[in-house]
Curated annotation (Swiss-Prot):
The gene is queC. ATP binds at residues 14-24. Its cofactor is Zn(2+). Keywords: ATP-binding, Ligase, Metal-binding, Nucleotide-binding, Queuosine biosynthesis, Zinc. It comes from Laribacter hongkongensis (strain HLHK9). Belongs to the QueC family. The keyword Zinc applies. Coiled coil: none annotated. This is 7-cyano-7-deazaguanine synthase. The keyword Zinc applies. GO terms for biological process: queuosine biosynthetic process. It comes from the Bacteria. Binds 1 zinc ion per subunit. Gene3D superfamilies: HUPs. Zn(2+) binds at residues 192, 200, 203, 206.
Length: 229
């Protein structure tokens, strides 16, 4: 297996959630060296960063957390504004859910590229997906390929953005997680918009996660761990 791995170094944007955890293990199966980067952007629940720390340690990869307080200062979305409740329906004008953080993926990936550049890392892995996305325009392949071009022009580099989940359903993502050995780490991942442990099971993120595991016919290792199974 090692002989089939790319000899280069990959950087994974790790949120502590299901998708980025799956991508971390996908990268471990394909690259000789893997590091993870997370962002403290004033997100609603610190449990996400705690999950990222735990998962990076389980995977045995170097993990860097970059502080960015800009998003909480901007406000206007339920993931950084404590006064807003997630899942109140799409905005009447933009038709986007209030959990959309404008520019988040663009900023994260640009910062990831800036961190990777002086370290000679050319591969950046992100867990965004177009098929199951919640209407987020920064999860679309054309958006991220345009960003890849901008990064390479702006940094005089040849970086590549890897999006292994882009066209996978949530069920396909669960199956991939099992294939790459991510299931033990998924037992410590966090998805719930409410920040609840155990997860609330009712928010859009919880419903989508449950649907994926159910359609894949695989028990959710997080629920099994919390139930003591």
């Amino acid at each position: 297996m090692d002989s089939l791995r790319d000899p280069e170094h990959a950087l994974v944007v790790l949120s502590g959630g299901q998708d980025s955890t799956t991508c971390l293990y996908w990268a471990l199966s394909r690259f000789a060296q893997v590091s993870a980067i997370s962002f403290d952007y004033g997100q609603r629940h610190r449990v996400e960063l705690d999950a990222a720390r735990t998962i990076a340690a389980m995977a045995g990869v170097g993990h860097t957390i970059i502080p960015i307080n800009t998003f909480s200062a901007l406000g206007g979305n339920a993931l950084t504004d404590q006064q807003m409740s997630p899942d109140t329906g799409p905005d009447a004008e933009t038709l986007l859910p209030n959990t959309f953080v404008p520019g988040r993926n663009l900023v994260f990936l640009t910062f990831a590229a800036a961190w990777a550049w002086p370290r000679g890392i050319r591969h950046i892995v992100t867990g965004v997906a177009q098929t199951d996305y919640s209407g987020y325009p920064d999860c679309r392949e054309n958006t991220l390929r345009a960003l890849e071009l901008a990064i390479n022009l702006g940094m005089e580099s040849r970086m590549r953005l890897h999006m292994p989940l882009m066209f996978l359903s949530k069920a396909d993502t669960v199956t991939l997680a099992r294939t790459v050995g991510a299931m033990p780490a998924l037992a410590f991942s966090h998805t719930c918009y409410a920040g609840a442990v155990p997860p609330c099971g009712q928010c859009a993120a919880c419903v989508l996660r449950a649907k994926g595991f159910a359609e894949a016919g695989i028990p959710d290792p997080l629920l099994n761990r919390l139930a003591g199974v």
